[in-house]
């Protein structure tokens, strides 16, 4: 199942809308594409821990995450929340019908709590 979640990337004092597409299909691999930095790539482990600690099951399918536009570098752990929500939507654990109404950003701790992020006011302007 393909779903879309929205986040943002800060460049200087501007924010650019980032579309996070999550697709779930047969298999059991996780792929993250779209110019993520190492902190974004590491989000996979934080997301797994946060979901398991809170009683969600990890999908036993291939997960492909595309962060577009691909030419903008995605930096930091603030993509944890939209990636986790996208994963839950793609696995049909939660309803994804209203995802297009929200821009999600937030770092997840291993227990699933949402941690503060830098530049949150800039995210309101994409």
Protein language model regions, located:
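Peripheral, non-AAA+ core regions of ATP-driven protein-machinery
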Residues: 1-125
């Amino acid at each position: 199942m393909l779903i879309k979640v929205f986040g943002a990337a800060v460049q200087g004092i501007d924010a650019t809308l980032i579309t996070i597409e999550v697709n779930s299909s047969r298999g059991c691999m996780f792929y993250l594409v779209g110019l993520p930095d190492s902190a974004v790539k590491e989000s996979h482990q934080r997301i797994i821990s946060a979901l398991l600690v809170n009683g969600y099951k990890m999908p036993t399918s291939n997960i492909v995450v595309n962060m577009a536009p691909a030419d903008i570098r995605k930096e930091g752990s603030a993509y944890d929340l939209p990636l986790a929500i996208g994963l839950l939507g793609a696995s049909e654990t939660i309803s994804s019908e209203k995802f297009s109404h929200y821009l999600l950003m937030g770092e997840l701790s291993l227990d699933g709590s949402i941690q503060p992020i830098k530049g949150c006011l800039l995210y309101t302007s994409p």
